Amino acid sequence: MTILSPKDVVIVDGVRSAMGKTKNGMFRHVRADSMSAELVRALVERNDFDPRDVEDIIWGCVNQTLEQGLNIGRNIGLLAGIPKTAGGQTVNRLCGSSMQALHTAAAQIMTGQGDVFIIGGVEHMGHVGMMHGIDLNPEASKHYAKASNMMGLTAEMLGRMNNITREEQDAFGLESHRRAWAATTEGRFDNEIIGIEGHDAAGRLQLCTVDEVIRPDATMEQMQKLRPAFDPVSGTVTAATSSALSDGASAMLIMSAQKAKELGLKPRARIRSMAVAGCDAAIMGYGPVPATQKALKRAGMSIEDMQTIELNEAFAAQGLSVLKALNLTDKQDIVNINGGAIALGHPLGCSGARITVTLLNAMEQSDTEIGLATMCIGLGQGISTIIERV
């Protein structure tokens, strides 16, 4: 049994929305901040703690404009009814934003700068497009290839470098959908998804509790017919082997072990180590490899010690390349066991906390003790978190 020290950072709870399609999806009439506020309220309702104890609300969001602008982290706290005494901030590490929110809160707890944090992330890619308002510096091309801004082309590069075939990618994508739909029908997402009101295709109000991007009817024959999405001449990456544009939010309740004990709350896991790392922007999908190597070293562990793993799965070529580099190709039965972003969607600022919440639930369902959540990040970064159930 793990003995916790007072300043250990523990995860008390974690929730998420279902993931909606960006194009005419179920959240097309729901704002990003409203969706997030629903999750914050759910954490307060599910756990017996005084929200006046919250030090800060830390929210990950990539495109911080329109409804996601003006410090959405603070707006979410106010919308959710969290006392005004709690702070609110918004962080941006592109796809790793909400995992960075977790790391920021953890570092503050470790250094005595607060005991209770609500962290999370959101991206409504239907309302705020990924490139909305972006004005890149022309001089950037002196330092990295312009194609590095095109995520699909970076996946093509990784696939070529690691000899990942089209057939392997199609099989990987199909398996993601199969696992995600099995997890859905077997109720394995029930503990993490908070129902949020949205609209069906006809515009009728509905409670959204099922990830909309999953294709339960996907077949290998369908996938093989698709043309390359990013390199029409010699490419292997298709829409079916890329994570879908989607809308969603995620949230976690983080405390010091001492505070959780004082409140009589049972922690579900503690954070063992955290890391970020950079890599060449042209192969940004490789980022989880150096980030994970750092996190493992800080935890005094090896990749063989990881019993359950969540990898963001931006593209099949990217995921397979990372698995190859981390010597996990033959251990895919412990990676994304409930499906990954190819099936579930990848709302940018939401994804880091989402995969950590999904990891925790998967560990509880599989009765494993040590887990790794890791992600690639645009322009060449990776971020990793190792957690241990307590």
Swiss-Prot record:
Gene3D superfamilies the record matches: 3.40.47.10
Pathways per UniProt: Lipid metabolism; fatty acid beta-oxidation
NCBIfam families membership: AcCoA-C-Actrans, fadA, PRK08947.1
Keywords recorded for this protein, A-Z: Acyltransferase, Cytoplasm, Fatty acid metabolism, Lipid degradation, Lipid metabolism, Transferase
Family: Belongs to the thiolase-like superfamily. Thiolase family.
Catalysed reactions, as listed in the record: an acyl-CoA + acetyl-CoA = a 3-oxoacyl-CoA + CoA
Major localization listed first in the record, in broad terms: cytoplasm
Matches recorded under CDD domains: thiolase
HAMAP family: FadA (MF_01620)
Domain of life: Bacteria
Protein name stated in the entry: 3-ketoacyl-CoA thiolase
Protein purpose: Catalyzes the final step of fatty acid oxidation in which acetyl-CoA is released and the CoA ester of a fatty acid two carbons shorter is formed.
One example of a Gene Ontology biological process annotation: phenylacetate catabolic process
Protein's UniProt keywords contain Transferase: yes
